[in-house]
Structure formats: structure tokens, C-alpha cells
């Protein structure tokens, strides 16, 4: 008799995706982040659902409703801090996942890669709108500054900003619609994840060597299920430690001050995971130019497969490209640091140099070095 998991209409889909899926035998821990992102999304949707039961999206009561969640709701503080720090974990895993894709040449699966970029934008939009909901000082001013950037779009900019605000400033209408979209977007993200996996399973996984692994495949279960569970335990332990010992470590103290349109905070800055893009935005002294650079800092990932000039897929055996990759990582850390600093000397010039380097490495240096490596290997 055939096993039910192979015949049942629903179970056979799960079986072919998580049980009998042929996977390369050489996948390292860098391949764990996809499943970790799935866990992050599940944690965010669950905690978010329970938070939404107690939150009110009205400018008069939003801040107090968050205080009420933390003080009066059973384990409300746990839910709130799991949700806030869960977002940080989400982005740590996201950036490591994208970094893995860049290093090992996974971007040559262009459909999977492009859906991934779409997912990155969707998660960033969700996180931005979520940050506005507690209606603290940084929520209000962050929303004002970032939405105001759209006014740089020629001709329609001002109308577009007022349309998004639902008035002439960030107010009640803005908060209500941001809450609606913040609730909706994670489900769109979940749907996109399904498409992401669908395209991935069309081609099969890449592996650290970048060499086709068809002759050497192993079943996903039990090998990678156990490996993924270990990853879950490590990540959830780290998240729990963050939530229970220093829940406000990654937040901004200004957000514990209720939103006040008449009082601007000394340094308006987004959450840490947007600082690199914020630094790139600030490094260009022109509004439209800055907005374009901000969008391109993420959209540049779509160009990476086109600029792949190496005869090898992975960077595993390409030391010169490896050097550039780690230089890129250092540049991103530098940009993250600069994004949190005031706009003054020497931070401005460091940010500008780092921004130029960021685009130069991805657009010029990596393709050139790849060609050079081909020549060195007489290919």
C-alpha cells in the first residue's frame, strides 16, 4: 500500500516540499536562513495578531493603548517586545540570507531572486509602517520625514504625499491606514513566500561549490529538518534572551515620548535595519537624487545577475571576489554606523565615501574582478 503522504492531495504537496525533496548533500549553515525567516514571519504574524486585539489606531489613544498592552494585558509586554525584537531578528536573517545569495551565486536563479527582492521591499514597507503605530516621537517624525521624500517626485510629488497622509500632515487618517496596511502586508508576504519557494523547487537548491549537485542528492527529511530545528532553537534562544534581558536595546528612547508635532527630536533616525539606506539617502545633497539612491540601494540587487561575468557561479574558489564581498560587508556596517550619527563633519564625508564604494563594488569592481579571475584561470 502506498504511503498516505504520497497520495493525499494536500499531504503530497507538503511531502514533495519538506520530506522527499531532493537536496544537495553539501549545504552549510548559510542555507538555514530561509527556514529561519519562515519562523520569524510566523512569530511576527502571531504576536501581531494578539497585539492588534488590544491596539487602537487613533492618534488620541494609540500611545496609551501600547502602554496598556505592556502594563495591563497578561504577558502583553512579552508580546510587544517579541514583536519589536522579532522584527530585528527578521532583518538580521534577511540580510544574512541575501548575503548568502550574493556570495554563493544563488542569484542566477533569476525568478527566485527577483521574488526575493520583491519580498525584501514588502518586509521593509511592513516594518516602516509598524514603527509608526506606537505613535511616539520617532514614530511620528520618522513617518513625516520618510513619506515627505515622495514630494521629490516631479509634478505629482506633493499631491502624492497628501494622498498618502490623507490630509496636510501625518495625522489620524495616516495612522489608521498605516495600521490597516501593516496588518495586511504580512499576509501578502506569506503569499509571496509561497511563490518564492515554488520557483526555488523548480530548479532545486544551489550549493556552496556552485557546481550542479544532481548526482549527489539526499532527502530533505531527516537531514535538513533536524538541521533546521537546531537553527530554530538557536535563533529563538537569542530572541528570548533579547526580549527578557534587554528588550529596549535596539529601540530608540525617543519613542517613549508621545508624538508631538510641535517638538522635533534632535536626531530623527529610523530603526537600525534601515540605517544603511538612510545614510545613502543623506549622503546626496539633493532631495530627488537622495530618494533615487535610496531606492537603488536595494534595487541594485536586481542588476547583480546581469553583471555576473565569472565563469564560476560561487565565490568559494574566487579569493579576489571574496575580498570585494567582505569589503562590501564592511561598507554596509560603516553606512549603518553613519546613519545613526548627526549630519556633521566628519560623518558626512565618511557616508559619501561609503555610499560611492557601495555602488562601485556592486556595479564596477565585482564584474571587472570576475573577468580578471577568468583570465588568471585561463578561461
Swiss-Prot record:
Heme in keyword set: yes
Q: Where are the transmembrane segments?
A: 33-53, 77-98, 113-133, 178-198, 226-246, 288-308, 320-340, 347-367
Subcellular localization: Mitochondrion inner membrane
One Pfam assignment: Cytochrom_B_C
Task: Give the molecular function GO annotations.
Answer: metal ion binding; ubiquinol-cytochrome-c reductase activity
Main subcellular localisation: mitochondrion
Q: Which family does it belong to?
A: Belongs to the cytochrome b family.
- Other facts noted in the record for this chain: Heme 1 (or BL or b562) is low-potential and absorbs at about 562 nm, and heme 2 (or BH or b566) is high-potential and absorbs at about 566 nm.
Q: How does it assemble?
A: The cytochrome bc1 complex contains 11 subunits: 3 respiratory subunits (MT-CYB, CYC1 and UQCRFS1), 2 core proteins (UQCRC1 and UQCRC2) and 6 low-molecular weight proteins (UQCRH/QCR6, UQCRB/QCR7, UQCRQ/QCR8, UQCR10/QCR9, UQCR11/QCR10 and a cleavage product of UQCRFS1). This cytochrome bc1 complex then forms a dimer.
**Protein name stated in the entry:** Cytochrome b
Tell me the organism's taxonomic lineage: Eukaryota, Metazoa, Chordata, Craniata, Vertebrata
The gene it comes from is: MT-CYB
Amino acid at each position: 500500500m502506498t504511503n498516505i503522504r504520497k497520495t493525499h492531495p494536500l499531504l503530497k504537496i507538503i511531502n514533495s516540499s519538506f520530506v522527499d525533496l531532493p537536496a544537495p548533500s553539501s549545504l552549510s549553515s548559510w542555507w538555514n536562513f530561509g527556514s529561519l525567516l519562515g519562523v520569524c514571519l510566523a512569530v511576527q504574524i502571531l504576536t501581531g495578531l494578539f497585539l492588534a486585539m488590544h491596539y487602537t489606531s487613533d492618534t488620541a489613544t494609540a500611545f496609551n493603548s501600547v502602554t496598556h498592552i505592556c502594563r495591563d494585558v497578561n504577558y502583553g509586554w512579552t508580546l510587544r517586545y517579541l514583536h519589536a525584537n522579532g522584527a530585528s531578528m527578521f532583518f538580521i536573517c534577511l540580510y544574512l540570507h541575501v548575503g548568502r545569495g550574493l556570495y554563493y551565486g544563488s542569484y542566477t536563479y533569476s525568478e527566485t531572486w527577483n521574488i526575493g527582492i520583491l519580498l525584501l521591499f514588502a518586509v521593509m514597507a511592513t516594518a516602516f509602517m509598524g514603527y509608526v503605530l506606537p505613535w511616539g516621537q520617532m514614530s511620528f517624525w520618522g513617518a513625516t520625514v520618510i513619506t515627505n521624500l515622495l514630494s521629490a517626485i516631479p509634478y505629482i510629488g506633493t499631491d502624492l504625499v497628501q494622498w498618502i497622509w490623507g490630509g496636510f500632515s501625518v495625522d489620524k487618517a495616516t495612522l489608521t491606514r498605516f495600521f490597516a496596511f501593516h496588518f495586511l502586508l504580512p499576509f501578502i508576504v506569506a503569499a509571496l513566500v509561497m511563490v518564492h519557494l515554488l520557483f526555488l523547487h523548480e530548479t532545486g537548491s544551489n550549493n556552496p561549490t556552485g557546481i550542479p549537485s544532481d548526482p549527489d542528492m539526499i532527502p530533505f527529511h531527516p537531514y535538513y529538518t533536524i538541521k533546521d530545528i537546531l537553527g530554530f532553537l538557536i535563533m529563538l534562544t537569542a530572541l528570548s534572551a533579547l526580549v527578557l534581558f534587554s528588550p529596549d536595546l535596539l529601540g530608540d528612547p525617543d519613542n517613549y515620548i508621545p508624538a508631538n508635532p510641535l517638538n522635533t527630536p534632535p536626531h530623527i533616525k529610523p530603526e537600525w535595519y534601515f540605517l544603511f539606506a538612510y545614510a545613502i539617502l543623506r549622503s546626496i545633497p539633493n532631495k530627488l537624487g537622495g530618494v533615487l539612491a535610496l531606492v537603488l540601494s536595494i534595487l541594485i540587487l536586481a542588476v547583480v545577475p546581469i553583471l555576473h561575468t565569472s565563469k564560476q557561479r560561487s565565490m568559494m574558489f574566487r579569493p579576489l571576489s571574496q575580498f570585494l564581498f567582505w569589503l562590501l560587508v564592511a561598507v554596509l556596517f560603516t553606512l549603518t554606523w553613519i546613519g545613526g550619527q548627526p549630519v556633521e563633519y566628519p560623518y558626512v564625508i565618511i557616508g559619501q565615501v561609503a555610499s560611492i564604494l557601495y555602488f562601485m563594488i556592486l556595479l564596477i569592481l565585482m564584474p571587472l574582478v570576475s573577468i580578471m579571475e577568468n583570465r588568471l584561470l585561463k578561461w
